[in-house]
Amino acid sequence: MSLIDTVRNTLVPVHREGYRFIAIFFVVSLALGFLWEPLMWIGFLLTAWCAYFFRDPERMTPIDDDLVISPADGTVSSVATVTPPEELGLGSEPMLRISVFMNVFNGHVNRAPMSGTVRRIAYRAGKFVNAELDKASQENERNGLVLETKHGQIGVVQIAGLVARRILCWTRESASLEAGERFGLIRFGSRLDVFLPAGAEPRVTVGQTATAGETVIAEFGSAKGPVISRRA
């Protein structure tokens, strides 16, 4: 095994979207070192933080069509019944919404909460208020996905925050996603909302820590014992 392979297998993987930012932080750190050496070391610490921010580790995803898995690392900021954003086309009936807030220290790779087919992708320009606030669901810049699942259509909404200024979504309409599969990323602090139809019961509470691709945030009916499968 080569040295590069050893390092790659030892360290937490970094998503390719972070390579450019890590390189910029590193080069700037070297440049600052010519001005004053302590600045270089501060820059290296920030470079390490940048790499940590874009971390993309493997996750053990429970595989069960009745389970809803957290789409993001972070803290559950809301569990409520609300009307979904109109651009999702999910109607005006209230749905269960579970929100996960990601601060700048959480990983920001987003994963599908259930297996299904992407029926709609809808982007909406907006503000950049604190993503922890309830009004962020309606006022902030956001990108929504509608997934056709065994239990009907669900909504997954990427919401920009105070610092976040770039929402990335790699999937496309008509694509099939598996539970826990990566579909997007939001840079530097943000939030994910999951909208679920009748029959879904929350399995998390406000303030609880959630792990993308692993934490069960809701379920339909009585889920059977989940099969554990490693995701790439």
Swiss-Prot record:
Molecular function terms from GO: phosphatidylserine decarboxylase activity
Main location: membrane
Active site: S190
Major enzyme class: lyase
Membrane topology: Peripheral membrane protein
Swiss-Prot/TrEMBL GO biological process terms: phosphatidylethanolamine biosynthetic process
Site location (Cleavage (non-hydrolytic)): G189, S190
Protein name, per record: Phosphatidylserine decarboxylase proenzyme
Lineage, opening ranks: Bacteria, Pseudomonadati, Pseudomonadota, Alphaproteobacteria, Hyphomicrobiales
